[in-house]
UniProtKB/Swiss-Prot annotation:
This is Small ribosomal subunit protein uS4. Keywords: Ribonucleoprotein, Ribosomal protein, RNA-binding, rRNA-binding. One of its GO terms (biological process) is translation. The keyword Ribosomal protein applies. Residues 97-163 form the S4 RNA-binding domain. PANTHER family: 30S 40S RIBOSOMAL PROTEIN, SMALL RIBOSOMAL SUBUNIT PROTEIN US4M. Belongs to the universal ribosomal protein uS4 family. Residues 16-53 are annotated as: Disordered.
């Protein structure tokens, strides 16, 4: 399955909620004011959604939020199921612990897609907990561990898009499970987030039900 490169707002309209795929400069409800209906000629279906369709839709929504493809998502689920604790919560914690997502959460990218691009272009450096040196990385899916430090490399620190992203993050707020110093353009991954720290609009139990069939 190829990565979607079409209009991002259309995906949010299809799911009926803001997936965070756009920068957030203009509020989601303003951008969709002309039509809150899903895209397409007929908009909302009159047929009641089946249990399976609701489960599948929730999986699609989460995949789109984090920019993860089908096989990769299935692998995350398998790993989450092997871990101790609630599978759905483990799944979300793993997705939130991805390097590209943390770069976004820290405010160095205005969207996850932009954060992913920063990582792919080797703009981001990581210092593993207990190590003394930063290393440049280009793999967005790296799973961060407690105490890992992220920084923007020196020659990229004046990029306008990074400065704009920090302004947006200041308005959005930084999660409690991260410690960020925007003046130094670096931050620490303190720990994986608990469920209370994660997006409330996600119903991970539907995804667990889907994979349990």
């Amino acid at each position: 399955m190829a990565r979607y490169i079409g209009p991002k707002l259309k995906l949010s309209r299809r799911e009926g909620t803001d997936l965070g795929l756009k920068s957030g400069v203009k509020p989601y409800d303003v951008k969709t004011k002309k039509s809150a209906r899903p895209p397409g000629q007929h908009g909302v279906s009159r047929n009641k959604s089946s249990e399976y369709s609701l489960q599948l839709r929730e999986k699609q929504k989460v995949k789109r939020i984090y920019g993860v493809l089908e096989r990769q998502f299935a692998n995350y689920y398998k790993e989450a199921a092997r871990k101790r604790g609630a599978t759905g919560e483990n799944l979300l914690a793993m997705l939130e612990s991805r390097l590209d997502n943390v770069v976004y959460r820290m405010g160095f990218g205005s969207t996850r897609a932009e954060a992913r691009q920063l990582v792919s272009h080797r703009t981001v450096m990581v210092k593993k907990a207990g190590r003394d040196e930063f290393i440049r990385v280009n793999i967005p899916s790296i799973q961060l561990q407690d105490g890992d430090v992220i920084a923007i490399q020196e020659k990229s620190r004046e990029q306008l898009r990074i400065k704009n992203a920090i302004e947006l993050a200041t308005q959005r707020g930084i999660p409690e499970w991260l410690d960020v110093d925007h003046s130094k353009l670096q931050g620490t991954f303190k720990k994986a987030p608990d469920r209370i720290d994660l997006p409330a609009e996600i119903n991970e139990s539907l995804i667990v039900e889907l994979y349990s069939k």
